[in-house]
Amino acid sequence: MNKFEKTLHFIKDVIHEDSPFYGQIYLVGGCVRDELLGERYSDIDLLVNMPNGQKAFIEYMCAEHADRCKGPFYYQRYGTTAMDVIIDDSLTLVECVEPHIEEYADDDITLLETRFCSLEEDASRRDYTCNALYKNLHTGKVLDPTGRGISDLKNGLLITPSDPVTIYRQDPVRMLRGIRFKHQKGFRLDPACWKAICDNADYMANAAPKRLRDELNKLLKSRTFCDGIQDLITTGLLQYVMPGIVEHFTNPMPFEGGEGGITLWEHTHRALSVQGREHPRTDTIYKLACLVMDIALLNGRDEVGQILLNAGIGREKVGSILHITELYERFRNMFDGEEYVAPPRVLVRFQNSLSKSRDNFRRLVRAENTGLLPEVQLPWRLFYDDGEGPQPRQRRDHDHRPASPASFPSDPEASSRNHKRNVKRREQRKRARSRRRNTESS
């Protein structure tokens, strides 16, 4: 049980049947979606189905269980009240809202009024039907006010519960979330939603930079984030997420050293594809370094630093990304084509300087080789330690099994004896290894 599940169990246990909150607390949004997908919670969003219920509930919890619940914290802009719950020395943020509907001016941007509403009205204003699901904390019953949230979730379809243009204009970050869900969860985006995103990308100028940065970081953790970046380019969203980078990615000039006359973006896309497919857990710093590597090589690190800072990425993180691009450029300068031209000690000192980052740097070099001509590819295998290296996969198809049936014991008793003998030998080898380790440690 992770910290989110423990927190929900705690809240469920302390709200008894005689409490006014009993039966009125719902898990909502991503919590319910992820649970139905068989995934673990990544955050906790609660809804209290009563007027001003979110404030009353959080204030009650912080007063009655002050040893566990710290707060309350009020976020007037989003109509949210939150608290920190401490269980087993782990801190979990719990955000709470009431069902509400927002009244906007004719521009669909200016918020005029927020009022309490029914669950059906609350569901109609959410971003996608698969996120408009409500699970009662005490009964466990899942409500689907739109009537299609569960079926859309099963079919992997992203569609807004009402007019997508209105939904996106009221909160432009929902467009970016749609792209992220498409690649993070493997969903399909409804054609009407895709068209609405393309037609209303300019509204992203009204979004808070921090929210855009958070969505970008989440997108980078998906296996197909390279295609996600391509979608951001196609829809016009990338110019708001990372201002200044689009002009480099849309440059039609062939990339120097690229295979078959590919452009800068085509090479970057191939490199990102390798990182996402083969090394999805690579630190996002290395993924961002891969994203801007070609720009740094052609236009310098100063321009890349400005692009990253304009995207709201912190200075410390930007410094780490630029350091990685500098390391890659230094490594590339050690070679003239396939020939190593630097003094021998330079490579040794360079490898030692990488320390714990050696694996990540090796993966980066390997990814950057993708789409380059063979004569300009860099030897990424140099970063394996002695005795290490990629092991060939053991093929187990029928073509590599003994062709003769005589090689298999036909006698069941003989087969059983062979099995017991092999088990005994494995145990003997295991005990021998254990004795060697004990001897070395003593």
Identify the residue ranges that each predicted region occupies.
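Catalytic cores of the polymerase beta-like nucleotidyltransferase superfamily
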Residues: M1-S442
